[in-house]
């Protein structure tokens, strides 16, 4: 990465100290990745949201797309699953800070180690697991690669409480649109 732009939505009644702390955390992460923040955009919103739009370059042989998976490839996950489920539960006070903290720590962790390992292993295809979850993103990758996959569900790394929360129907809003997809 070379440069990043902040994208912050925050209730203005929280004051500038909260915004400053969030933006400083983002700047620290961007610096850790070897880039700098050149600006961004903020909006007043009841629900806090923060992200970065990151710009950079990569060598052609280091670009891995979500198409190109081949029969026999293994699926590697670099972080546990269940971020959306656990954060949805936190928003409605169904879990405590002790269950939320590992999720926050994971979201703050850079993906650089996984990226380097993926390139070194000459990975055929990759995807991120974000709003559409593993099912949605894996489906997209497999469809683009004209492949199928067998998942050993019990071996999937999950955040504490994620499975029980899912069974209790505490799921992020996108869950059911992913099922329709």
Protein language model annotation of sequence segments:
Residues 1-2, 124:
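Short acidic/polar active-site loop segments enriched in Thr and Asp
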Residues 41, 67, 78, 103, ...:
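Glycine- and other small-residue-rich loops at beta-strand/loop junctions that grip anionic moieties
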Residues 53-63, 98-118:
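Active-site glycine-rich loop that binds ribose-phosphate moieties when present
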């Amino acid at each position: 990465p070379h440069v990043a732009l902040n994208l912050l939505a925050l209730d203005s009644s929280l004051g500038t100290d909260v915004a400053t702390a969030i933006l400083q955390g983002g700047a620290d992460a961007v610096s850790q990745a070897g880039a700098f923040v050149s600006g961004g955009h903020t909006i007043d919103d009841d629900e806090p949201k923060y992200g970065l739009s990151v710009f950079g370059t990569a060598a052609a042989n280091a670009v891995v797309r979500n198409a190109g998976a081949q029969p026999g490839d293994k699926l590697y996950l670099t972080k546990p699953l269940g971020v959306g489920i656990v954060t949805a539960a936190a928003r409605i006070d169904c879990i405590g800070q002790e269950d939320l903290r590992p999720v926050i720590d994971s979201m703050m962790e850079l993906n650089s180690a996984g990226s380097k390992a993926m390139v070194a292993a000459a990975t055929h295809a990759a995807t991120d697991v974000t709003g559409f979850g593993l099912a949605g993103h894996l489906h997209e990758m497999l469809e683009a690669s004209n492949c199928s996959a067998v998942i050993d569900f019990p071996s999937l790394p999950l955040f504490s409480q994620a499975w029980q929360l899912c069974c209790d129907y505490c799921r992020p809003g996108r869950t059911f649109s992913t099922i329709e997809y």
